[in-house]
Each structure stands twice: as C-alpha cells, then as structure tokens.
C-alpha cells in the first residue's frame, strides 16, 4: 500500500514538474508585424500559427495627440476581450510601436499616453508594455538635456505603471552596461528592459552574455527575433538553445515574442514566417524543457 502511494505521489510530482516546464516560457507574436494591428482577426491568426498569445499594438500615433486606439471604446473593449478569451489567446503585452518613429522627448503628454496604454493593458489582462526609444534620436545616449528630459519622462511613466502593478519595458538599442546605467538613472520599479535579440545581433554582441549582464530582474520580456533575413530555424546569428540554457540558469521565465525574422524571399507570407518562428521557439523552449 505504501509503495502504491509513493508511486502515485511520484507520478503527480512528474506531472507538476512537466506543467511548470510548459509554462516557464510562452510564445507570442506582434500583431502589427502580422498586419493585424488592433484588428479582431489577430486572435484567430494567433491561434492558426500556434502561438500562446499576441502582443497587441496601441495603434498609430503620428501627429495625433493620443494613439489611434480602438480600445478606448467600450464596444471594442468587450469585443476584443471576449474574442481573445473564447479562442484561448492571451495578451501578455501591449506595444506603443508609434515611438519607433515619434520622439518621446518632445511629447509633453507622455503621462496621458502612458495611461492610455495602461488602461488598454488592464482591459486585455496584460502586465507588460513595450516602449521603443528608436524615434527619440541618439542625443539622449550621452549626458545632457535630452537625456535628462527622457529620464524624467520615463520615470513618470514608470511610476504610473508601478502603481498599477504593471511594467513598461523599454527597448534602448544600447549594450547591457549602458542600459543598466540608464535604468539606474530612471529609478523606477515600473521601468525594465524589453530585451530585443536583434539589437545585439546587429551590433555583433553575444546575446547570451548580454542577457547574463542584464540579469533576471531587469528583463520584463523578450523579442526573440532578428533582422529580416531568414526564419529563426535557419539563422546562424543566434544559438537559441544556448539562449535557453542561459535563461534557465538565470532563473528567468516569461514571454518570448516574435517581431521579425521573416524570410526575405517570402516576406509577405505572414503565416509561413510567424508560424515557422513560433514552432521553432516552442520546440526549443517548451518541448525541449519537457525532455530535461
């Protein structure tokens, strides 16, 4: 009887361990890169490519005061949330991709923009916002007025996120050492790094070494893709198994989000590119985890 009890207990522990392994890393894709920015069809497409979730965008920004955001409308709030839930598609994060082109330093309404994003996150159950700094130029990368202004605005936005139990992940384009310095200046628990493999690969930096330098607690989420060339399964610029082993040792867990890594010969084939990349990441980070 005792032996049977121990056998059952051991089997339960194996199942629990397997469940944890499946959930340690989850895989999503960016709606705007799949040509589904704030379109209801993004959830069905996410299901079709086999992803666990989708990173929704806030909508275009341009010269607008606020994002072109459908989810300020109660009708779309209910419709989008119901559709995502009914298909079992999670929304781990919401992107402010408008700041790839717009300069945050020159925006006086940064708090309003942050609140718009945080409200949308709350509706969709997301905990992480993506904020790229690509549109803010390069002057802020060195000491001076531009950096001081950016740091203050990011601090303000971070505190709004912190108060709601959320995080804004910034994409800096800098190496780990410089990024850590920037985070210390911002000094807000609501601001972390949204790590992008593409930046380090393009700069010739070692992805695994940069991840280790950043450390588990500074990384909110990861864009696990590179500059368009080939899909991840054929790209020699990143050793994804080594990346997984690095993250395992760091004790990091969370969402890996496909942004690019499109085959330039089939750049418009959304299902092929994102489906291939999602399957590859799942093979490495989920199926591989179950075999350990």
What do the predicted segments below correspond to?
Residues 7-16:
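Bacterial N-terminal signal peptides
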Residues 70-77, 108-115, 143-154, 206-212, ...:
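Charged helix-capping and loop-helix junction motifs
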């Amino acid at each position: 009887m005792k032996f049977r009890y121990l056998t059952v207990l051991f089997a339960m522990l194996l199942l629990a361990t397997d469940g944890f392994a499946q959930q340690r890393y989850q895989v999503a894709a960016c709606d705007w890169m799949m040509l589904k920015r704030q379109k209801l069809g993004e959830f069905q497409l996410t299901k079709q490519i086999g992803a666990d979730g989708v990173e929704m965008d806030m909508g275009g920004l341009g010269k607008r005061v606020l994002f072109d955001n459908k989810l300020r409308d109660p009708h779309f709030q209910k419709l989008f949330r119901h559709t995502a839930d009914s298909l079992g598609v999670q929304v781990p994060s919401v992107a402010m991709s408008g700041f790839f082109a717009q300069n945050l330093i020159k925006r006086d309404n940064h708090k309003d923009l942050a609140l718009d994003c945080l409200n949308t996150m709350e509706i969709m159950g997301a905990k992480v916002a993506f904020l790229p700094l690509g549109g803010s130029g390069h002057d802020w990368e060195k000491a001076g007025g531009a950096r001081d202004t950016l740091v203050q605005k990011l601090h303000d936005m971070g505190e709004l996120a912190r108060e709601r139990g959320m995080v804004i992940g910034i994409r800096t384009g800098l190496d780990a050492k410089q990024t850590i310095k920037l985070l210390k200046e911002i000094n807000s628990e609501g601001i972390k790094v949204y790590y992008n493999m593409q930046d380090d690969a393009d700069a010739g930096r070692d992805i695994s070494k940069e991840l280790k330098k950043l450390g588990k607690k500074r990384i909110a989420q990861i864009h696990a893709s590179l500059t368009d060339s080939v899909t991840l399964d054929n790209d020699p610029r990143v050793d994804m198994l080594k990346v997984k082993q690095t993250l395992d040792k760091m004790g990091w867990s969370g969402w890996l989000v496909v942004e690019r890594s499109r085959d330039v010969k089939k750049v418009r084939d959304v299902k092929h590119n994102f489906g291939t990349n999602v399957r590859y990441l799942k093979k490495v980070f989920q199926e591989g985890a179950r075999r350990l």
